[in-house]
């Protein structure tokens, strides 16, 4: 059964849109130091030349700050910010309406650009390259091509699946930026900043406990902080301590590494039903009754980054870390079998 309301899902929810908790500048933004440093240079150079910033593509798992960075870029460039997403732009007319309303150097943000309609994508190419729209007006013998000049704008796009972008689209982004999961130390700073903006007293240990369970994702850290605040207020606690954070998150079924029941079902299924793997993604999706995309985009990235599973051409394989987390003993021949598997695959 699908679980759209998972507390630790990195996907956006209404409560995550609290603009008061969002950083308003690159200096306020915590984490992604290399990306921020490069963006500062590109923004400053574009401002000095009085030109539109080159098109930017953010790549990375959900919840790492792609939308926030796009908004900050527009603010630091001193231009307007327009936002949409790939699935919303259903036809060429929708894209034309967006592009023709942009002013000089404005930022247009397209989230989930990998889900853009292929027919719309074709229209986007000349818009990005030549700042022109090539539209076909009418049908049949009466059809004619019309060129519309556009203001020089900056397209900032975000994707969780770089491999799903066509090569022509990918090549038109002059500034590719890959975002990675945050460290516990970075998330602790984010939690403490959020608590300060909420006027919520929190101890260093309390902030770290929330950060440890946030799966390397600021959006999840903010959501966990809100739920822990609820427990602290009802308990009339003077501050969020490690004990309060631990009790709240344990009651919410978020374990000490940030896994919930769905994550545990995933690991348990591979361990119990398939002896630790390898097992194919389609089999896992069927066993969990979850879409393949949700598993690849939401469940697996953090597990892979933390070393709980490995992706191989033959399927997913549990690591020793995963077996230890489950409190199970791996099959005696696991190491030898996995060694043979990796040797054959290489």
Swiss-Prot record:
The keyword Transmembrane does not apply. Coiled coil: none annotated. Residues 1-182 are annotated as: Large ATPase domain (RuvB-L). Homohexamer. Forms an RuvA(8)-RuvB(12)-Holliday junction (HJ) complex. HJ DNA is sandwiched between 2 RuvA tetramers; dsDNA enters through RuvA and exits via RuvB. An RuvB hexamer assembles on each DNA strand where it exits the tetramer. Each RuvB hexamer is contacted by two RuvA subunits (via domain III) on 2 adjacent RuvB subunits; this complex drives branch migration. In the full resolvosome a probable DNA-RuvA(4)-RuvB(12)-RuvC(2) complex forms which resolves the HJ. The RuvA-RuvB-RuvC complex processes Holliday junction (HJ) DNA during genetic recombination and DNA repair, while the RuvA-RuvB complex plays an important role in the rescue of blocked DNA replication forks via replication fork reversal (RFR). RuvA specifically binds to HJ cruciform DNA, conferring on it an open structure. The RuvB hexamer acts as an ATP-dependent pump, pulling dsDNA into and through the RuvAB complex. RuvB forms 2 homohexamers on either side of HJ DNA bound by 1 or 2 RuvA tetramers; 4 subunits per hexamer contact DNA at a time. It is found in: Cytoplasm. It comes from the Bacteria. Keywords: ATP-binding, Cytoplasm, DNA damage, DNA recombination, DNA repair, DNA-binding, Hydrolase, Nucleotide-binding. Residues 256-346 are annotated as: Head domain (RuvB-H). The gene is ruvB. ATP binds at residues 21-22, 63, 66-68, 129-131, 172, 182, 219. It comes from Rhizobium johnstonii (strain DSM 114642 / LMG 32736 / 3841) (Rhizobium leguminosarum bv. viciae). PANTHER family: HOLLIDAY JUNCTION BRANCH MIGRATION COMPLEX SUBUNIT RUVB, PTHR42848. Belongs to the RuvB family. This is Holliday junction branch migration complex subunit RuvB. It catalyses: ATP + H2O = ADP + phosphate + H(+). Its EC number is 3.6.4.-. Has 3 domains, the large (RuvB-L) and small ATPase (RuvB-S) domains and the C-terminal head (RuvB-H) domain. The head domain binds DNA, while the ATPase domains jointly bind ATP, ADP or are empty depending on the state of the subunit in the translocation cycle. During a single DNA translocation step the structure of each domain remains the same, but their relative positions change. DNA binds at residues 292, 311, 316. GO terms for biological process: DNA recombination; DNA repair. It is an enzyme of class 3 (hydrolase). GO terms for cellular component: cytoplasm; Holliday junction resolvase complex. Residues 183-253 are annotated as: Small ATPAse domain (RuvB-S). Mg(2+) binds at residue 67. Transmembrane segments: none annotated.
């Amino acid at each position: 059964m699908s679980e759209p309301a998972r507390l630790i899902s990195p996907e956006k929810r209404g409560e995550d849109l609290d603009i008061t908790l969002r950083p308003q500048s690159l200096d306020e933004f915590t984490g992604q130091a290399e990306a921020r440093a490069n963006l500062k240079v590109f923004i400053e150079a574009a401002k000095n030349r009085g030109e539109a910033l080159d098109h930017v593509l953010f790549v990375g798992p959900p919840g790492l700050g792609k939308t926030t960075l796009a908004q900050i870029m527009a603010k630091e460039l001193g231009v307007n910010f327009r936002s949409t997403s790939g699935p919303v732009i259903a036809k060429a007319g929708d894209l034309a309406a967006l592009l023709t309303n942009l002013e000089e150097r404005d930022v247009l943000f397209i989230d989930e650009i990998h889900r853009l309609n292929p027919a719309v994508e074709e229209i986007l190419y000349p818009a990005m390259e030549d700042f022109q729209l090539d539209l076909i007006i009418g049908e049949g013998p009466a059809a004619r091509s019309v060129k519309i000049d556009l203001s020089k704008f900056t397209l900032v796009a975000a994707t969780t699946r770089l491999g799903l972008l066509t090569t022509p689209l990918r090549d038109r982004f002059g500034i590719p930026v890959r975002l990675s999961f945050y460290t516990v130390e970075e998330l602790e700073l984010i939690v403490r900043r959020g608590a300060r903006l909420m006027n919520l007293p929190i101890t260093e240990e309390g902030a770290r406990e929330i950060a440890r369970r946030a799966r390397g994702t600021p959006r999840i850290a903010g959501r966990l902080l809100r739920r822990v605040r609820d427990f602290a207020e009802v308990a009339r606690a003077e501050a969020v301590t490690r004990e309060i954070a631990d009790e709240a998150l344990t009651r919410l079924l978020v374990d000490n590494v940030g896994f919930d029941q769905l994550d545990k079902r995933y690991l348990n299924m591979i361990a119990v039903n398939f002896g630790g793997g390898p097992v194919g993604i389609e089999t896992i999706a069927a066993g969990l009754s979850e879409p393949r995309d949700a598993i690849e985009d939401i469940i697996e990235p953090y597990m892979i980054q933390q070393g709980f599973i490995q992706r191989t051409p033959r399927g997913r394989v549990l690591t020793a870390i995963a077996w230890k987390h489950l409190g199970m003993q791996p099959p005696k021949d696991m190491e030898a079998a996995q060694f043979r598997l990796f040797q054959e695959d290489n």
